């Protein structure tokens, strides 16, 4: 497999500004992610004393998996005080978008580089956001159908949308297998298809909860790298979190004030507010099989779905004795994660790192230092066919990744058309506009006639526009094969107006290139970069 790094002219300059140590952006974080001294400081930080307990919890969580020797070793390293590089993601259908796997590769790559540079073992940890309850965000994925030249949405259907956390949801296995079958129908059959289908079927048969199936697929893909997994909703982990839940409940108003103040500062720097929440407690409580947002009305803590209320002593007692009923929101999850782990760096997507920029004062309030916040690696897969099509139409890869192919497609259509025809129609449009101006001069002061002339002009311009559009549409139809090829480039490299990794699913890559494509023996060694990585299997 070939690997190269390209620099894109990104519309969103947040990550490029992190790369260049822009003082406005770096001021939002505890550490400058582009400076080596930041890593030296983090590596030398004293541990929090929770590493041995965490290692036991992670071992228990992964006990239903057959651990690799690398994972066994990393659990031992963690127990002995090794620091971690960490990141997380929701449990998407069949693994969800490719960026989930690229985030894990980011964690693997950075932890290895830190281990090699500092001669201290750094452990890669992936945090599964099983506490989330928005099932609509994880119950679907997309698949590219080569025969149709288009993307198809594949969705797991359920009679009732679960309101509990994803970790507490147990999908119907028959329906899930039907969803899997639908996905494979759209994918082309390769020498890898049958083996991949068997792996997926086995995972569905062997595991019951939504997140356990997700975990098993990740484990199948990354066990050789020694990645450790933990679900935020895992009950033994929640018991470890009880002291912090109590602190959050006791300081909830100060926490909310700190968050709002930091968010306002980011907006004062010209950034849009990323975290949208009305709560002033920033925790959820599981009650009546629903994950319910907690708020405080000045007297009581109140649940948003059942209107159940608690006085302060009651809700703190729940945190003490039943912490598994609590879960974090977008504000408190990073805080809890860093309170638990001895983290060198947190790896996040473009939106996630902007969330973290709004939390600096929250960390300071709880005397928890924000780790280095690193943008994850961004990766696109380029196959031989797409590479040949880019060459055929002389389209720069970097341009497609940023803008898609619509501009190049329109240019191609016009190149196939009669230049004289287009020029004459455009000339007629310009002539009509000049005529309209002259006519308006003739009827100046008479509003009825002005309206008449403008309406007449509008009709003529519409007719000329229609003529030109229909003519170009005919040219487009005459070049149907090329249009399909442009669409193929678009759906592969810039699907739905964004990067491939935001839409394409892991199974598509495994089906095309083999179930061992992500294994250390096959996947190219990566170096951490803020730029874009192109991998050609």
From Swiss-Prot:
One Pfam family per UniProt: Rossmann-like_BshC
Gene Ontology molecular function: any one: ligase activity
Keywords linked to the UniProt accession: Coiled coil, Ligase
EC number, UniProt record: 6.-.-.-
Naturally occurring in which organism (per UniProt): Staphylococcus aureus (strain COL)
Coiled coil: 422-450
InterPro entries in UniProt: Bacillithiol_biosynth_BshC, CC_BshC, Rossmann-like_BshC
Protein name per its UniProtKB record: Putative cysteine ligase BshC
Family, similarity comment: Belongs to the BshC family.
Domain of life: Bacteria
Function (record text): Involved in bacillithiol (BSH) biosynthesis. May catalyze the last step of the pathway, the addition of cysteine to glucosamine malate (GlcN-Mal) to generate BSH.
């Amino acid at each position: 497999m070939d690997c190269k790094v390209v620099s894109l002219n990104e519309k969103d300059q947040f990550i490029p500004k992190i790369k260049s140590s822009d003082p406005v952006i770096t001021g939002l974080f505890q550490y400058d992610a582009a400076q080596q001294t930041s890593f030296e400081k983090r590596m030398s930080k004293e541990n929090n004393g929770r590493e041995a307990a965490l290692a036991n919890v992670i071992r228990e969580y992964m006990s239903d998996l057959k651990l690799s020797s690398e994972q066994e070793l990393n659990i031992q390293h963690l127990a002995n005080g090794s620091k971690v590089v960490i990141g997380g993601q929701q449990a998407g259908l069949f693994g969800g978008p490719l960026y989930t796997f690229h985030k894990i590769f980011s964690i693997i790559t950075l932890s290895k580089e830190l281990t090699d540079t500092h001669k201290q073992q750094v452990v890669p940890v992936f945090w599964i956001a099983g506490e989330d309850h928005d099932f609509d965000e994880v119950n679907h994925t997309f698949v590219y159908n080569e025969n149709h030249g288009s993307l198809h949405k594949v969705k797991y259907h359920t009679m009732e949308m679960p309101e509990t956390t994803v970790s507490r949801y147990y999908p119907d296995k028959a329906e899930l297998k039907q969803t899997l079958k639908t996905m494979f129908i759209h994918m082309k059959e390769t020498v890898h298809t049958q083996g991949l289908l068997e792996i997926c079927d086995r995972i569905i048969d062997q595991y019951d909860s939504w997140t356990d199936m997700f975990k098993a697929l990740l484990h199948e893909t990354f066990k050789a790298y020694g990645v450790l997994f933990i679900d935020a909703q895992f009950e033994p982990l929640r018991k470890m979190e009880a002291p912090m839940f109590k602190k959050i409940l006791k300081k909830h108003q100060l926490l909310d004030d700190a968050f709002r103040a930091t968010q306002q500062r980011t907006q004062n720097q010209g950034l849009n507010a990323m975290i949208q929440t009305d709560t002033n407690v920033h925790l959820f409580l599981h009650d009546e099989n629903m994950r319910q947002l907690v708020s405080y009305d000045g007297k009581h803590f109140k649940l948003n779905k059942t209107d159940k209320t608690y006085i302060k002593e009651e809700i703190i007692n729940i945190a003490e004795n039943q912490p598994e009923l609590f879960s974090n929101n977008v504000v408190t999850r990073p805080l809890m994660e860093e309170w638990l782990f001895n983290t060198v760096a947190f790896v996040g997507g473009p939106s996630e790192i902007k969330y973290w920029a709004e939390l600096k004062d929250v960390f300071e309030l709880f005397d928890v230092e924000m780790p280095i916040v690193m943008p994850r690696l961004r990766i696109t897969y380029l196959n031989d066919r797409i590479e040949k099509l880019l060459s055929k139409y002389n389209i720069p890869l970097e341009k497609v990744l940023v803008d898609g192919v619509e501009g190049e497609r329109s240019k191609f259509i016009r190149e196939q058309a009669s230049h004289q025809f287009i020029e004459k129609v455009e000339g007629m449009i310009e002539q009509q506009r000049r005529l309209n101006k002259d006519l308006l001069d003739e009827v100046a002061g008479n509003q009825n006639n002005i309206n008449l002339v403008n309406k007449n002009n509008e009709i003529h311009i519409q007719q000329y526009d229609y003529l030109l559009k229909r003519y170009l549409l005919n040219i487009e139809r005459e070049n149907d094969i090329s249009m399909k090829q442009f669409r193929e480039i678009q759906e592969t490299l810039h699907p739905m107006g964004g990067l491939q990794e935001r839409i394409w699913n892991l199974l598509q890559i495994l089906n095309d290139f083999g179930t061992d494509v992500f294994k250390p023996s096959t996947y190219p060694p990566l170096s951490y970069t803020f730029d874009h990585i192109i991998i050609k299997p």
